[in-house]
């Protein structure tokens, strides 16, 4: 499937699954909850995401390093306008 047809949440899901070998992964678009706030997308989609994630790569690293791994995996999306990414490591 062409990534141009995927939502931002779907693209990030695909990226995190590929890069971090996830065993559990949910990417939830919460942009609609932030309508009218600074950084909110005018379309109401893709500016605020929540990630619930588990990966075997997280077992030997600190909480800060886990978050760094996630942020490093999606940095290009942040550079393109993703405003907020909440991370919940399971």
Regions found by a protein language model. Give the residues of each.
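Contiguous, often N-terminal, cationic amphipathic patches that form binding interfaces
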Residues: 2-64, 71-72, 79-90
């Amino acid at each position: 499937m062409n990534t141009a047809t995927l939502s931002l949440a779907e693209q990030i899901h695909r990226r995190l699954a590929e890069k971090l070998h996830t065993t559990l992964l949910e990417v939830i678009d919460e942009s609609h909850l932030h309508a009218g706030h600074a950084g909110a997308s005018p379309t109401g989609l893709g500016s605020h995401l929540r990630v619930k994630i588990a990966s075997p790569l997280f077992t030997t690293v600190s909480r800060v390093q886990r978050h760094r791994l996630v942020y490093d995996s999606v940095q290009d999306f942040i550079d393109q306008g993703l405003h907020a990414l909440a991370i919940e490591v399971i």
